[in-house]
Structures are given as structure tokens and as C-alpha cells.
């Protein structure tokens, strides 16, 4: 999965997919009542990027729905996965459940079109704080209450705080999550980070009793760091330059082992090295 980083304006969906992304990451900020409000990152952000592009969250979902609904004039067949980077740092811990509830209602209405031919992309809810695991509970219980539990088949999870892998496993246990787990590791492109924790995550994925289904690394903009991540066995790379990742993947050393995921590839299924 080539994951376009910080896609927060509708116009950027086309831009990143046209550069080779089959997945995008979108920032979601919340108001003080835990409503998802804007797709917005803010300053500071990755080096070389404009930090302030934004839409209202529900407006963005409308654009995303069009981009992922077959038959729509804006449809991109290859856009198959969306990571919502949930900026829950602005919330109190006791608001996490509410945030999950409100997020589910927004997606149900504006993305899934109440279950009637809505957008088809798989969704990863990426949460920066292990203490906010109840966001997952709120999300799940709301879709059940709204009589669309089947949409949970399209939803996966990520804790993005670079926490100890054992601690992440405990948070999933509390949230009752037993699958659909993506594990991120990374740092802003302005700084360097080694691959030690990525290798631990890959080892967990490849073990017989691990909780991780997929591992992705962020934010990778250079050919050398792309090769290093691929050599470590990741499933996804988040980038500001999808064309760079696509180019490295086309090298003969990688074409034998990697290909770009399509809609038929289940993102919750573990593919071991």
C-alpha cells in the first residue's frame, strides 16, 4: 500500500492517486464536544509540505465517497484504503467513546451513504493515544445501534504513538479487538528514525500468536529509506511522494516480492514474509 500522507483537501485526492497512491491518510481534528470537525493538520507538519489545507470533515467525506464509488465521475479504482489520523490529543480521555460515536455517525451518513452504495474503501481508524481505546468501542457500538454492523468488516485499527508493542496489545484487548490491526511506526520526514521497532512489529505479524496483521512505516520520501523499509518487510509506506515509492517498487529486486495492492487484496489478512 502506497499511502499518500496528509491528504486534507478534496483536490489532493486526485493529486496523490495520480502520483501512484492506492491509499491516503487524512487528519481529523475534533471540536471540544468530540465532534469530528475538520480535515486539518496545522503547523508544524512535514518538511516541504503546506500544513494548512483543510475541509470540513463531512464535506471531505463527500468528496472521498465520490472518489471511491464505482460509476461516479470522480471514481479512482485504485484508491482502496483510507487512514484517518484521529487528532484526539485535543480531547479529554473520557471523551474518546463520544468521539467514536460521532465519527461513526458522520461516516455512516456522509461516506457509507447509510449503507446504500456508499464509498467502498477500507478504513483504518488511527488513534495516537492508547488511553483512547474506547473510541473503538463507541464506533463499533454505534454502527450496531444504527443497524449497520456489517460495515465493521471495512474498518481496521492502528495506535500511532510508537508505544511498546506489548502495551498496544493490551489496549486492543481492552477494546475487544481481535483482528483488522495495522501497526504504524515512524516520525516526521524532518527527522530520522531507525527501523528497530518496525522490525519488532514485522516479527509480531509473522509470529504464530501476534496481534498485528499489517505494518506500515511513515513518512518516507527518499529512495534509500524506501528500500530499507521494503527490506524490513513492511506492508505499507506512507509518503509525501507516492511516485518515488512506486518507482522503487518497479525495480527488479522488488517486483518479484511486492506488488501494489488492489481492492481484491484484503487489508486485514496477514501476508507473512
Curated annotation (Swiss-Prot):
Pfam families: GDPD_2
Main location: secreted
Top-level EC class as recorded in UniProt: lyase
Catalytic activity, EC: 4.6.1.-
GO (cellular component) term, any one: extracellular region
Binding-site residues, Mg(2+): 25, 27, 85
Similarity-based family: Belongs to the arthropod phospholipase D family. Class II subfamily.
Function: Dermonecrotic toxins cleave the phosphodiester linkage between the phosphate and headgroup of certain phospholipids (sphingolipid and lysolipid substrates), forming an alcohol (often choline) and a cyclic phosphate. This toxin acts on sphingomyelin (SM). It may also act on ceramide phosphoethanolamine (CPE), lysophosphatidylcholine (LPC) and lysophosphatidylethanolamine (LPE), but not on lysophosphatidylserine (LPS), and lysophosphatidylglycerol (LPG). It acts by transphosphatidylation, releasing exclusively cyclic phosphate products as second products.
Protein name, entry field: Dermonecrotic toxin LsaSicTox-alphaIB1aii
Organism: Loxosceles sabina
Amino acid at each position: 500500500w502506497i499511502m499518500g500522507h496528509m491528504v486534507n483537501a478534496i483536490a489532493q485526492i486526485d493529486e496523490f492517486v495520480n502520483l501512484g497512491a492506492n491509499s491516503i491518510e487524512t487528519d481529523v481534528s475534533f471540536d471540544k464536544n468530540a465532534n469530528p470537525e475538520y480535515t486539518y493538520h496545522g503547523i508544524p507538519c512535514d518538511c516541504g509540505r503546506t500544513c494548512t489545507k483543510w475541509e470540513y470533515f463531512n464535506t471531505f467525506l463527500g468528496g472521498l465517497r465520490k472518489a471511491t464509488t464505482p460509476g461516479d465521475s470522480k471514481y479512482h479504482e485504485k484508491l482502496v484504503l483510507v487512514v484517518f489520523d484521529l487528532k484526539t490529543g485535543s480531547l479529554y480521555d473520557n471523551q474518546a467513546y463520544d468521539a467514536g460515536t460521532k465519527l461513526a455517525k458522520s461516516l455512516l451518513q456522509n461516506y457509507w451513504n447509510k449503507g446504500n452504495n456508499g464509498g467502498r474503501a477500507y478504513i483504518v481508524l488511527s488513534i495516537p493515544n492508547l488511553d483512547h481505546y474506547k473510541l473503538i468501542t463507541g464506533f463499533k457500538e454505534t454502527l450496531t445501534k444504527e443497524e449497520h454492523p456489517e460495515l465493521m468488516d471495512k474498518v481496521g485499527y492502528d495506535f500511532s504513538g510508537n508505544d511498546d508493542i506489548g502495551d498496544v496489545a493490551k489496549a486492543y484487548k481492552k477494546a475487544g479487538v481481535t483482528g483488522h490491526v495495522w501497526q504504524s511506526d515512524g516520525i516526521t520526514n524532518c527527522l530520522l528514525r531507525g527501523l528497530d521497532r518496525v522490525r519488532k512489529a514485522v516479527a509480531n505479524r509473522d509470529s504464530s500468536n501476534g496481534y498485528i496483521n499489517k505494518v506500515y512505516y511513515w513518512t518516507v520520501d527518499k529512495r534509500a529509506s524506501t528500500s530499507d523499509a521494503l527490506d524490513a518487510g513492511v506492508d505499507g509506506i506512507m509518503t509525501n511522494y507516492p511516485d518515488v515509492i512506486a518507482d522503487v517498487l518497479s525495480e527488479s529486486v522488488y517486483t518479484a516480492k511486492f506488488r501494489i495492492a488492489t481492492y481484491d487484496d484484503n487489508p486485514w489478512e496477514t501476508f507473512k514474509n
